[in-house]
């Protein structure tokens, strides 16, 4: 997170409205760093599978650059252009020296990094004993709604369904102000988190 916590605190003290999003442990870390509640702070956490080793990512990125003859300029870890069941990684490479941009899609089943990640082989040690799974300090939690086909088949489509968990009154206010054009269905908390 670098110096993000300090920047958030500075913005909060100056009276700016701040929306902070991150993994559960990042949100919890911010709240602990701040040491008090701020009315002008809204926190959203993303249900997290875990965070892979930064060293492994660096080596993977270097490997892809060498293999594809370019510089990695962007990455979408869960690209769902072909639907959310067969997601994969979309990598944006800038070729050298021609300066052309190429996009590569690698299915989750064909990418060694994604396979290691999804099978929990490369997560940080703290992820295996994650305390943020049980203690949520965010106002809203968002995620892919894995298992929607079993809970609410009418909400299942090929592009994916999002799960929103409202955790505080502040989170509820934001959700109510943003949901006017959403197709929604309320489900139990247990059904919502079962696949995550």
Residue ranges and their predicted role:
Residues 1-196:
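Iron-sulfur-associated redox domains of electron-transfer enzymes in respiratory
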């Amino acid at each position: 997170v670098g110096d993000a916590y300090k920047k958030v605190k500075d913005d909060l003290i100056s009276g700016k409205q701040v929306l902070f999003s991150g993994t559960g442990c990042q949100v919890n870390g911010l709240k602990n760093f701040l040491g008090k509640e701020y009315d002008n702070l809204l926190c959203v956490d993303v249900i997290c599978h875990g965070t892979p080793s930064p060293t492994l990512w660096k080596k993977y990125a270097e490997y892809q650059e060498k293999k594809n003859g370019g510089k990695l300029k962007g990455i979408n870890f869960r690209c769902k252009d072909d639907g959310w069941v067969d997601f994969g990684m979309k990598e944006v490479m800038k070729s050298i020296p021609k300066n052309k941009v190429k996009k590569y899609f690698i299915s989750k089943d064909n990418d060694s990094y994604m396979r290691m990640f999804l099978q929990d082989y490369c997560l940080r040690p703290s992820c295996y004993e994650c305390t943020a799974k049980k203690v949520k300090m965010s106002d809203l939690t968002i995620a892919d709604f894995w298992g929607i086909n079993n809970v609410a088949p009418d909400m299942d489509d090929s592009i994916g369904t999002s799960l929103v968990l409202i955790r505080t009154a502040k989170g509820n206010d934001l959700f109510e102000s943003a949901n006017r054009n959403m197709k929604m269905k309320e489900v139990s908390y247990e059904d919502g988190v079962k696949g995550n």
